């Protein structure tokens, strides 16, 4: 048995779970918010007890010390020696990393080199790595990349129709994201179906405030909806998804906005927020959809884009064995799943409205005779991080 810390470090936040492996049992979990502020928030949950404090947390190193001290002071562990390894989420692995990797000084340097591909996320992820290495220098640490799962995509899926030197000199290509989630649910789907992953054609729909659809054939990602950045693909909470690129200079010309300002609109002021006119939260939009035409339109656009990707990816794989719904909306929105699945019967997808009336629970929602299965699988990226950390740290799980 091993105790693995799964870490997700943001620019001013630090999420953590202490997981007992191989049982995947969460012993403790918590969140540090507003790092660098005088009123930072530290919350931890262990043994059913929740503790929350507001205090000054100067930087990530202080946050890590608080995190570790809370684990010992609450008796979750007796000493830091009981932490066998630490797994870090890293958003972008570029073309360097097609798998998770044991962290060394050389690996840290490579992550730094590709940080320009994810300037908001990779530096924050690295800050978390440095903070833990400072306090737990002898403990093995593993980097788990959001992009790694998609490195199996063939060139025909990831290349853009742009001058070749843009790819060769600047790394411009499709990378895809949410890979850790797509990998986890695909492995879980194989278990539930009782079929080896190497014999399955799956479409994984990770639908939260950010959303992506991935075609998984024989256990490998062969295409995914997000692109060079997480802005591409389907309509999302505040992100536009795919648009005509000529709109960017057109909007600049009409509004006087800079390219960065237009990009900010596409990332933070578009998507469901723009379509509905009042919220990026699907729950709010669903609530008003019966009486608000724009809310109903937002739901139709959101579901319709995902619906199209399912048809496209089924064609790309020459068939389909199962559709997976995961993440906050995918797991909990009966309405969105219904809108996405309606009209796919011609593909052999027969879903049961009664079974679909479920939230946050692992469940098949197809009729027994349906050739294509439809499964809700709650994602667990932390468990996937822990599994990869155990595998690469050489721990006996």
Swiss-Prot record:
Stored PROSITE patterns: ACETATE_KINASE_1, ACETATE_KINASE_2
Describe how the cofactor binds. Mg(2+). Can also accept Mn(2+).
Active-site residue list: 146
User: Is Zinc given among the entry's keywords?
Assistant: no
Q: Does the keyword Magnesium apply?
A: yes
Q: Which EC number(s) does UniProt give?
A: 2.7.2.1
Question: Which cellular components does GO assign to this protein?
Answer: cytoplasm
Q: Cofactors per UniProt?
A: Mg(2+); Mn(2+)
Broad enzyme group = transferase
Q: Where does Mg(2+) bind?
A: 8, 381
Instruction: Say what the protein does.
Output: Catalyzes the formation of acetyl phosphate from acetate and ATP. Can also catalyze the reverse reaction.
- Per its UniProt record, what PANTHER family does this chain match? ACETATE KINASE, ACETATE KINASE-RELATED
Q: How does it assemble?
A: Homodimer.
Q: Which HAMAP family match?
A: Acetate_kinase (MF_00020)
Protein's UniProt name = Acetate kinase
As recorded in Swiss-Prot or TrEMBL, the protein's gene is named ackA
């Amino acid at each position: 048995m091993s105790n693995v810390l799964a870490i997700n470090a943001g620019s001013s936040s630090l999420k953590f779970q202490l997981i007992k492996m191989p049982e995947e049992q969460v012993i403790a979990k918590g969140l540090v918010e507003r790092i660098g502020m005088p009123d930072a928030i530290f919350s931890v949950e262990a043994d059913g007890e929740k503790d929350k404090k507001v205090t000054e947390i100067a930087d990530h190193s202080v946050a890590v010390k608080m995190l570790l001290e809370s684990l010992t002071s609450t008796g979750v562990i007796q000493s830091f020696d009981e932490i066998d390894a630490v797994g870090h989420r890293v958003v972008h692995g570029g073309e360097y990393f097609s798998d998770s990797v044991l962290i060394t000084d050389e690996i840290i340097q490579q992550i730094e080199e590709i940080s320009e591909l994810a300037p908001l996320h990779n530096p924050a992820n690295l800050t978390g790595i440095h903070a833990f290495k400072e306090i737990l220098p002898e403990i093995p640490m593993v980097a788990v990349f959001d992009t790694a799962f998609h490195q199996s995509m063939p060139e025909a899926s990831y290349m853009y129709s742009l001058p070749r030197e843009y790819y060769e000199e600047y790394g411009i290509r499709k990378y895809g994201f949410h890979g850790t989630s797509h990998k986890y649910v695909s492995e879980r789907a194989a278990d539930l179906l009782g079929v080896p992953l190497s014999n399955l054609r799956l479409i994984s729909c990770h639908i939260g405030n950010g959303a992506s659809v991935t075609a998984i054939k024989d256990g490998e990602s062969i295409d995914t909806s997000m692109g060079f950045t997480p802005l591409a693909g389907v309509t999302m909470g505040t992100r536009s998804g795919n648009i005509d690129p000529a709109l960017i200079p057109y909007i600049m010309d009409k509004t006087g906005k800079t390219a960065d300002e237009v990009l900010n609109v596409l990332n933070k002021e578009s998507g469901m927020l723009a379509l509905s006119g009042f919220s990026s939260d699907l729950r709010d939009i669903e609530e008003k959809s019966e009486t608000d035409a724009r809310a109903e339109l937002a739901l139709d656009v959101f579901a319709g884009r995902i619906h199209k990707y399912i048809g496209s990816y089924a064609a790309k794989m020459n068939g389909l064995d199962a559709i997976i719904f995961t993440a906050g909306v995918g797991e909990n929105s009966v309405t969105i799943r219904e809108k996405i699945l309606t009209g796919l019967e011609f593909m052999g997808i027969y879903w049961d409205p009664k079974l679909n009336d479920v939230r946050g629970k692992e469940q098949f929602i197809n009729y027994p005779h349906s050739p294509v299965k439809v499964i809700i699988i709650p994602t667990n990226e932390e468990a996937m991080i822990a599994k990869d950390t155990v595998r690469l740290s050489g721990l006996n799980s």
